[in-house]
Amino acid sequence: MKKKIISTFACVFILAGWQTAQAQSKPLEKVRLTVPAKALTFVPYYFGKAQGIFAKEGIDLEIIVMRPPLGVTALLAGDLEYTAAGGLSFRAALKGAPLRTITFIQTRLSFSLVGQPGMTPARIHNVAVSGIGSLAHYAAITVMKRLGNEKVTYISTNTTANSYTALLAKSVDAAIVTPPYTSMAILAGYPDFGNTFDVRDLQGGLVARLQYLHERREQARAMIRATLRSMESIVKNEVEAVAYLQRGFALEPKIAADTYRILKQIVNTDGDIEEPVLKTILEKLKQESGVTAEVPLDRLVDLSLLREVKAEVGKK
């Protein structure tokens, strides 16, 4: 009798082990996400992929670098599942495109104004920005206004990397940059004239087609869950995050550590955004786009999935 009981328990454990192995061997679902550049704004996706956070949610995340207009076009065509190009997606949705932002990974602008050694705010005559009319341009105007010097010329360089290069080449008096260029410049002795970490705007999110959200609701929940867990892990695990910045973005230890200090201030671990802030951003975009008609927020965002996930994991 005793041998039969032992044999029965052995069978149960073998069956349980087989079921676990089967669950673990279930193939991951390929999910494609476009980002405008391999930039630190989108580090939650890169870090989460490297740390296996997305894989734990059953997602084989493929991150594709693609210019925002192409990324949004591919998304609308159904050629991929998500884009992180929040700003352009918002503008497209504003004009009627069936896109919805479902999570915000950054709602504080990560720009800093860095000047030439020995430069003072009053002596700044020109500032390098990645593009006229861009968030970088808006951030530069904001900082210069705070410094009391609005009589400056803004020079478009196409990319933040080019703005940083222009600063090093002494082609400009100052440049508006984001991490890691902020830390690279400041640690090299360039003066920091201020930042926009307190300015609320859209600088990264998770966007999907409306039809996809209706058809693949559970998959979208898994994507949101992984994104939130990745952001939380970045903030709570400094050693791992700094090590990843060195490895994944080829940053020197001191630059990685200082970059992490900035990231910790701007990563939106909640994934959400306050309605008044969202309305202010919407009004700004309407003015820029020449839209005068009333636009409901639910034409641009669908945060119901995010809030379901947060309730599920006990986030408040």
PLM features per residue range, with description:
Residues 8-17:
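Bacterial N-terminal signal peptides
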Residues 80-85, 262-278, 308-315:
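Short amphipathic alpha-helical segments at helix boundaries and their inter-helical linkers
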Residues 87-88, 161-249:
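Pocket-lining segment of extracytoplasmic ligand-binding domains
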Residues 1-9:
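Bacterial N-terminal signal peptides that target proteins for export
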Residues 215-293:
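Secondary-structure end/capping motifs
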Residues 23-166, 173-179, 192-200:
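Short, glycine-/small- and polar/acidic-enriched structural segments
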Residues 47-48, 111-120, 203-218, 266:
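A bilobed periplasmic-binding-protein/Venus flytrap-type ligand-binding module shared by bacterial periplasmic
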Residues 286-316:
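Conserved C-terminal helix/tail region of periplasmic/extracytoplasmic solute-binding proteins
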